[in-house]
Amino acid sequence: MSYEERVNAHPNLGDESDVEEEALVNDYREQVNFDDGMSELERTTSLGTGSQTQDLQAQLAAAATPLEYQATLETKFASYDNYCSLFHYILNSEGPVELEVPSYYWAWDVIDEFIYQFESFCRYRNRVARSGSNEEEAQLLRENPNTWGCYSVLNVLYSLIQKSQINEQLAAIKRGEDPLAFAGEYGSRPLYKMLGYFSIIGLLRVHCLLGDFSLALKTLDDIEMNKKAMFARVMAAHFTTYYYVGFSYMMMRRYGDAIRMFSHILVYVSRTKNFQKGGNSYDAIAKKNDQMYALIAICVALHPTRLDDTIHSALREKYGEQLLRLQHGGPDALPLFEELFRSACPKFISPTPPDFDNPALNIDPVDHHTAIFMDEVKNTLYNPTIRSYLKLYTTMDLKKLAGFLEVQPEVLRSWLLVNKQRSRQVRWVEGGLLEGEVVSANDLDYALENDLIHVSETKAGRRLVDWYLRNLARVY
């Protein structure tokens, strides 16, 4: 069971060609019936008994095994101790640990499960502190503030990255140089290289869960978002990467880039769904798909744009009436924005332990980030209505438009200024994920000269050549 299976219970950034998509689809065929051969390994309690290699394999296999959903608090503490023992041995042994990992799928499962248990423990601890109903568990959690602590988890991920020198290796690959020249004694071993690589994806996820979206994107500076990337070979890692990158872009108001991220992974999933049927993760991916469509519906409402035909059809099928309500804006759309956001956002966590002595002071991180997002939605709530009026004129008096909208002229002026500022978005062109150029996100622009509004509209023609090439490739 992977991360997606528990949700809700639990390249190049430009348009990719169908040839590249087909390569990803073909690669996924190899993953459907994948078996890493480690299912027979039993959990061990010590790395010092028996064969050291076999013990380490057993520890890694146990680390990749999901914890039971109703696990007790003592079991969660024990799981944390086991992870500490495992990573301490890998990171602090005299010289590299000699072990050939069976596959990169396995390395991803270890990091994925490690972060999932951290995330679920933080949510559980916050829930106990806020309810104040179980004093025995609250006391146990109060006495162990560092168990599954944020610092400990981040320290493990950063240490694995540093030990493997994976960032230096990835940077060398981008320069066309030999990565082994920069790998060092540890990074040349598959165990360290794979754990280090997927720790980068893990950092993206953790920083996003903590609400630091710019740092989340910064962690991927040395990873190229294309079909050749290692994460693209593992369905769960591929899905996770694009989901968290897209969500981070959305929270940074880079809606165009967020739509591109979501569209990529949704098209990929739609093309591989026949291979997923019957697999253990099919239901989980289907649920996560609905979340992705909810996020793309939000982005399209805040940033109207043309979508891929496949995405557009599926979006109208899933959220047809709701999408229209979002696009019309106004106060009636606020509850729908909040509902979709809550259903599709990550399960945010707090970086610090809660205050068990004052339960009322503990804020739900999901509520906190939802409130931040809804403040942004409220700023742009009347943009669709204002836009519909401005499209009818080349010049218009501010007071006249205020009369149409039944608001005070100065209130309208503030709306117009906010709308114009929000229409300037950073859009990725090349380089790191945080880089980009400031562009106008709308085909409607205006300027204020005292009380006179000057309106200009530019419509980009559809790129018919690209459309024909894309559809011909699908037919032939």
UniProtKB/Swiss-Prot annotation:
Coiled coil: none annotated. The keyword Ribonucleoprotein does not apply. Its main location: cytoplasm. Residues 257-452 form the PCI domain. It holds the Pfam family Paf67. GO terms for molecular function: translation initiation factor activity. The keyword Protein biosynthesis applies. One of its GO terms (biological process) is formation of cytoplasmic translation initiation complex. GO terms for cellular component: eukaryotic 43S preinitiation complex; eukaryotic 48S preinitiation complex; eukaryotic translation initiation factor 3 complex. Belongs to the eIF-3 subunit L family. Component of the eukaryotic translation initiation factor 3 (eIF-3) complex. Component of the eukaryotic translation initiation factor 3 (eIF-3) complex, which is involved in protein synthesis of a specialized repertoire of mRNAs and, together with other initiation factors, stimulates binding of mRNA and methionyl-tRNAi to the 40S ribosome. The eIF-3 complex specifically targets and initiates translation of a subset of mRNAs involved in cell proliferation. This is Eukaryotic translation initiation factor 3 subunit L. It comes from Neosartorya fischeri (strain ATCC 1020 / DSM 3700 / CBS 544.65 / FGSC A1164 / JCM 1740 / NRRL 181 / WB 181) (Aspergillus fischerianus).
